[in-house]
Amino acid sequence: MIGLTKVCWTMSKKEVVDNSIKIEYLRSSFDNVQSLIQFADQKIGNLLLIDTITVGIFITYATNYELSLKDLTVWNILLFITGLIFTVSSVILVYKSIIKVVCSAQSELGLFYKS
C-alpha cells in the first residue's frame, strides 16, 4: 500500500511539473503573438504614411496651376497610376501581414494544444 501511494504521489508531482511547463509555454506563446500583432500594426502604420505622402504629392501637382494643361494631364495620369500602385501594393502587404500574424498565432497556440 505504501508503494502504491508513492507511485501516485510521483505521478501527480510529474503532472504538476508538466502543467507548469505548459502554462509557461502558453504565456510565452501569447507574448510572441502580441509582439507579432505589434509588428503588423507598425507595418500598417508605415504603409498608411506612404499612402498619405503619395496622396499629398498627387494633390500638390494636381493643384499646381503653373504647369500647362497638357503637362497637368500627364502628371495627373502618372500620379494617379503611382498612387493606385502604392495603394494596391500596401493593401496586399497589409493582408500579408495580417495572414502572417494569424498563421503564427495559430501555430504557436496549436503547438501548445498538441503537446
UniProtKB/Swiss-Prot annotation:
Transmembrane residue ranges: 44-64, 74-94
UniProt entry tagged with the keyword Membrane: yes
Membrane topology: Multi-pass membrane protein
MF terms in GO: nucleotide binding
Chief location: membrane
Keyword match Nucleotide-binding: yes
UniProt keyword terms in alphabetical order: Antiviral defense, Cell inner membrane, Cell membrane, Membrane, Nucleotide-binding, Transmembrane, Transmembrane helix
This protein's GO CC annotations: plasma membrane
Subcellular localization, as worded in the UniProt entry: Cell inner membrane
GO process annotations (BP): defense response to virus
Function of the protein: Pycsar (pyrimidine cyclase system for antiphage resistance) provides immunity against bacteriophage. The pyrimidine cyclase (PycC) synthesizes cyclic nucleotides in response to infection; these serve as specific second messenger signals. The signals activate the adjacent effector, leading to bacterial cell death and abortive phage infection. A clade C Pycsar system. The effector gene of a two-gene Pycsar system. Expression of this and adjacent uridylate cyclase TpPycC (AC A0A1T4LJ54) probably confers resistance to bacteriophage. The genes are probably only expressed in response to bacteriophage infection. Probably only responds to cUMP (produced by its cognate NTP cyclase), acts by impairing membrane integrity.
Name assigned to this protein: Pycsar effector protein TpPycTM
Gene encoding the protein: pycTM
